[in-house]
């Protein structure tokens, strides 16, 4: 088997020794970075309350100095979502060539604890969650900057995933895939959960101290979890023209009632539809070029 070693870090504890280890062993390092300094420091603070931006950038420079392959993972929240082009241009300036934008959608129960996606009673959306309309505009603004200037040079995970849907391929992420359950979550104590978005008691599969990891991945409980993504889609999703692109997105975010019991709509649906509708012609053009074996860079000069 070919073993690939990616690691996700906030970058605070990176030093030369770690960076050398990553380089020597071919690690891909994901750095959590939420944009320019004020955007990043809004929510990513150290234990003393200070912002962590300077430390993260120091760690990134060490990775670059050691020749370690890295990419950026950006949590899009209520604050940085209002400044899409500043965020995008900042990432371009860092020397990164790949960025993953992850929308922050979190709910808490009356006690303040985080809730699972569907079925949580009396849950409230956190104030730092991104708004659906803002998420859609965030994606659009960045897309039109990217499609005119950076196609082929800079890679945005969600754009790649959408294009995959247009050409009938599996996306490179789980949340646009038809089924869930391919990536288990392993906790520090050996507990294994169905997904890192569902680290809750009802999604505990077992523990690697006594269970075989392959058996847990192929267990009936995990199979049911994975298939539920499609089986629980409401009618409005099943009839949507963009179903083959987003497949209802992540079940964690399906918290908006659809009128059908147990079949919620994705909280971000309105934002996604806004983005899909305004970029459809561009993705259709790129999909045509890909299917014909042509280079997609021609889309930079297309005018619709």
Spans of model-derived segments:
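Canonical radical SAM enzyme core domain
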Residues: 1-24, 29, 33-39, 47-58, ...
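Generic recognition of stable, solvent-exposed alpha-helical segments in well-folded globular domains
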Residues: 17, 55-58, 82, 86, ...
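Radical SAM enzyme [4Fe-4S]-AdoMet core and its adjacent flexible, acidic
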Residues: 42-54, 61, 65-175, 179, ...
């Amino acid at each position: 088997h070919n073993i690939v070693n990616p690691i996700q870090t906030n970058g605070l504890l990176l030093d030369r020794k770690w960076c050398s280890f990553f380089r020597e062993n071919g690690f891909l390092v994901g750095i959590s970075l939420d944009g320019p300094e004020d955007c990043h420091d809004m929510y990513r603070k150290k234990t003393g309350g200070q912002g962590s931006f300077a430390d993260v950038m120091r760690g990134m420079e060490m990775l670059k100095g050691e020749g370690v392959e890295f990419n950026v993972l950006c949590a899009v929240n209520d604050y940085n979502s209002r400044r899409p082009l500043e965020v995008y241009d900042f990432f371009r300036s860092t020397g990164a060539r790949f960025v993953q934008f992850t929308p922050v959608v979190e709910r808490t129960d009356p006690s303040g604890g985080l809730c699972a996606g569907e079925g949580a009673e009396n849950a409230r959306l956190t104030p730092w969650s991104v708004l659906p309309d803002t998420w859609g505009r965030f994606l659009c603004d960045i897309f039109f900057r990217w499609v005119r200037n950076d196609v082929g040079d800079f890679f945005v995970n969600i754009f790649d995933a959408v294009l995959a849907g247009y050409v009938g391929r599996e996306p490179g992420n789980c949340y646009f895939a038809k089924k869930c359950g391919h990536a288990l979550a392993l906790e520090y104590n050996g507990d294994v959960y169905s997904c890192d978005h569902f680290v809750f008691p009802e999604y505990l599969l077992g523990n690697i101290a006594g269970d075989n990891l392959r058996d847990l991945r192929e267990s009936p409980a995990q199979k049911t979890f994975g298939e539920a993504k499609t089986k629980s889609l409401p009618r409005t999703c099943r009839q949507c023209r963009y179903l083959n692109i987003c497949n209802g997105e992540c079940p964690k975010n399906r918290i908006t009632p659809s009128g059908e019991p147990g079949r919620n709509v994705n909280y971000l649906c309105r934002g996604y539809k806004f983005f899909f509708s305004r970029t459809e012609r561009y993705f259709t053009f790129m999909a045509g070029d890909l299917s014909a074996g042509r280079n997609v860079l021609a889309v930079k000069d297309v005018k619709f």
